[in-house]
């Protein structure tokens, strides 16, 4: 007869806790166990809607949050040092949530840095995209110029496309062929748009009647969860990237049906103006978009809020994004930075598996728990 002792039970419990997830997977979250997508390289930093620029052998990460936090690292996998914030106080945009801008996008243009950011509320079109600029990418020298575009209310909000869209999730792109700068933006409602910017990036070119490109739309579906646009170029194609699905608020709004959470999608075109089509030649204005990266391995959930860093020093392009680690949690503050190098197959971007397994997120495994069960049996029979 086996005599189960209290010390034996306590030791078994300690062994179990040492390998069990810190925050067990919520029973309502359906995290795909597909291996069709590679695991991410871990960024080792909490970040929702990250924007990353490379400058002087360092990476600078900007994320949504109070006054737009700024981090610096010499490697995309960290360690990241928090430097401060872009803004010194509330945004000059006169709308709610002035202290906590969303989804910043930072770029360098003609020896000056620009930070485009969103001011909005969940589920509202009364939004604005603001812009700040600085001679330095680091905190301390940024000047807030206030709103660039308004939707819902405010100057210019009655002009197309601002009268049908939602001014959040800004992205900047300079056409490498013509040099023309563009702003891409949009979320839900009528989808994602592109407008040309003036040379100083502080206003829309021909603001009362901008030369508008409609890039992404879901014409027959409600809701219309396309947002988080990013434009990149690799000759001969322009790539319109976006996030599709429910991004967040899983604790308050619940988990969507599997496959309806965030995923990263793309279309391509030989013109910056489009039309953009996916692998099946479906127009992004008709609900198209090839899935480049989605939930995977029972561990990675709802990747999105993406950007693409052009390759440097012979390295490939980098796809970076935020995602939720199912072993950690699904709150807004649990979103983490992930990244993968990109290969291009027949002109389509494909994320590359991490080359350093020690830096990648590891899928859940039952092996550790099986070992614990065996050790517990040994302990119970010997104590």
Swiss-Prot record:
Residues carrying covalently attached carbohydrate according to the record: 75, 163, 206, 325
The site (Important for catalytic activity, responsible for pKa modulation of the active site Glu and correct orientation of both the proton donor and substrate) lies at 169
Q: What GO CC annotations are associated with the protein?
A: plasma membrane; side of membrane
Q: Which chemical reaction does it catalyze?
A: Endohydrolysis of (1->5)-alpha-arabinofuranosidic linkages in (1->5)-arabinans
Q: In which pathway does it act?
A: Glycan metabolism; L-arabinan degradation
Catalytic residues at 49 (proton acceptor), 227 (proton donor)
Sites of GPI-anchor amidated asparagine lipid attachment are 356
Q: How does it sit in the membrane?
A: Lipid-anchor; GPI-anchor
A GO term, aspect molecular function: arabinan endo-1,5-alpha-L-arabinosidase activity
Residues that make up the propeptide are 357-383
Q: Which UniProt keywords apply?
A: Carbohydrate metabolism, Cell membrane, Glycoprotein, Glycosidase, GPI-anchor, Hydrolase, Lipoprotein, Membrane, Polysaccharide degradation, Signal, Xylan degradation
Q: Name one Pfam family in it.
A: Glyco_hydro_43
Q: Which PANTHER family match?
A: ARABINAN ENDO-1,5-ALPHA-L-ARABINOSIDASE, ARABINAN ENDO-1,5-ALPHA-L-ARABINOSIDASE D-RELATED
The identity of this protein, by name, is: Probable arabinan endo-1,5-alpha-L-arabinosidase D
Q: What gene is this protein translated from?
A: abnD
